[in-house]
């Protein structure tokens, strides 16, 4: 996808893998303390800092822990959020993201999923190929789970029932 030039964003990553020539994109990476240095910035530290800036896009290259809570907070407060997380399908990736949020917070799984329903699309990739895309269309109070609409699965696109 393309981020419009009038939008700003932060890209938070462990190593400098993601890049762009976008004029208003801020890049931050993890710093490990080495030797006598006491300076250390984790993905979580950088995510917390990202919430203090005026951004349209909030991007974390790969979520693996407590930074998930701040990513969820950014999504819940209207940022456009992009990240990667390991899962076996597009729908299971959201459950894994909820797990990571749970590590950092005392929110219930249901509360986490209610907040995560602001994430609009989930893309599942395998062997560098898109296998599945799901749209998050809401949260079900009956099943206490996210409600998805399949968009794409292994070469097949699904029609949106909301379109004529």
Residue ranges and their predicted role:
Residues 2-115:
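Switch/coupling sub-region of P-loop NTPases
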Residues 116-164:
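Conserved P-loop NTPase
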């Amino acid at each position: 996808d393309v981020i419009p030039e009038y939008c700003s964003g932060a890209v938070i990553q462990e190593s400098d893998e993601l890049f762009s020539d976008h004029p208003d994109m801020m890049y931050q990476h993890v710093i490990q303390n080495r030797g006598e240095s006491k300076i250390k910035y984790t993905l979580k530290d950088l995510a917390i800092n990202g919430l203090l800036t005026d951004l349209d896009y909030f991007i974390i290259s790969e979520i693996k822990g407590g930074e998930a809570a701040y990513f969820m907070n950014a999504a819940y407060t209207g940022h456009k959020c992009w990240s990667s997380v390991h899962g076996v399908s597009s729908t299971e990736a959201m459950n894994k993201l909820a797990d990571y949020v749970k590590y950092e917070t005392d929110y219930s799984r249901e509360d986490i999923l209610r907040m995560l329903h602001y994430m609009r699309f989930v893309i599942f990739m395998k062997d560098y190929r898109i296998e599945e895309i799901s749209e998050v269309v809401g949260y079900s109070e009956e099943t206490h789970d996210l409600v998805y609409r399949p968009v794409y699965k292994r070469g097949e696109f699904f029609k949106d029932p909301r379109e004529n």
